[in-house]
């Protein structure tokens, strides 16, 4: 792939002197949206690190709390349902404000009852398409992008595992930054690397409870696959024609907001 989902919208030319993003043992899918390198754009520029971070639930231990505090995160956006947030409360970075944006619009996220791996894959693809078509999803993502554009300082958004709800908004930000499509997909799939120990632990538990069959059936729910993100992109094309139309018409954000995000995202 080599194209981008959204044409460039302008931006600054500041140098990237941000510190390396720490690996957090207690929040294993924590990372900089801009990547470790950082990511290149299709027009020869690169993303700016230290602006937006993504994560799974913020179950910070003492050492990781100290590490994340050094990043100066001013705002945290929790994309989970109320019941998810109640079960696993966030440990916020020092001085950060928090806002809940319930992407699913339901009281809780209920793991579906599936009896085949194919059914699990179908559920994940349907969920990805719902990020594009669902009213609650569009409202939450539109509000999040607006807040990310307007908010001062570094900002963090997270879901439970940090791979699906958070993975979609990260893909949107990379699209706004004009990152190549293959890089966007590679970034999406990195959740499988960052969450490897968690995936193994969940798989081992499923195997102990229901044998190899149960572990195999539920495996697609624990990880990300290229076809999940592609299902979302395909739905954008089917429903709105272009990513730009999805952002402005579907999510209700202005071109000025897109321009501001691009300026913040790209060096």
Mark where each language-model region is.
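Ser/Thr-glycine-rich phosphate-binding loops at phosphate-binding pockets of nucleotides
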Residues: 161, 165-166
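Cys-dependent protein tyrosine phosphatase-like superfamily
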Residues: 1-155, 169-267
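Histidine-centered active-site/metal-ligand motif
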Residues: 158
């Amino acid at each position: 792939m080599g194209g981008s989902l959204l044409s460039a919208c302008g931006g600054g030319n500041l140098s990237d002197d941000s510190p390396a993003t720490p690996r957090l043992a207690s929040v294993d899918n924590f990372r900089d949206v801009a990547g470790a390198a950082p990511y290149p754009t299709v027009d020869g520029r690169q993303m700016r690190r230290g602006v937006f971070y993504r994560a799974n639930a913020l179950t910070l231990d003492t050492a990781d709390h100290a590490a994340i505090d050094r990043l100066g995160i001013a705002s945290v956006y929790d994309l989970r349902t109320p019941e998810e947030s109640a079960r696993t409360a966030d440990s916020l970075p020092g001085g950060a404000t928090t806002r809940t944006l319930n992407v699913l619009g339901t009281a809780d996220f209920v793991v579906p009852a599936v009896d085949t791996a194919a059914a699990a894959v179908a559920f994940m693809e349907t969920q990805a398409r719902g990020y594009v078509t669902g009213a609650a999803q569009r409202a939450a993502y539109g509000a999040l992008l607006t807040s990310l554009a307007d908010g001062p300082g570094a900002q963090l958004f997270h879901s439970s595992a940090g791979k699906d709800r958070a993975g979609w908004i990260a893909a949107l930000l990379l699209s706004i930054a004009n990152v190549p499509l293959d890089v966007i997909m590679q970034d999406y799939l990195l959740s499988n690397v960052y969450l490897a120990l968690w995936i193994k632990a969940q798989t081992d538990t499923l195997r102990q409870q229901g044998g190899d069959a149960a572990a195999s059936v539920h495996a697609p729910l624990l990880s990300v696959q290229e076809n999940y993100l592609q299902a979302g992109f395909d739905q954008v094309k089917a429903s709105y024609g272009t990513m730009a139309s999805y952002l402005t018409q579907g999510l209700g954000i202005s071109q000025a907001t897109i321009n501001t995000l691009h300026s913040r995202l790209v060096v």
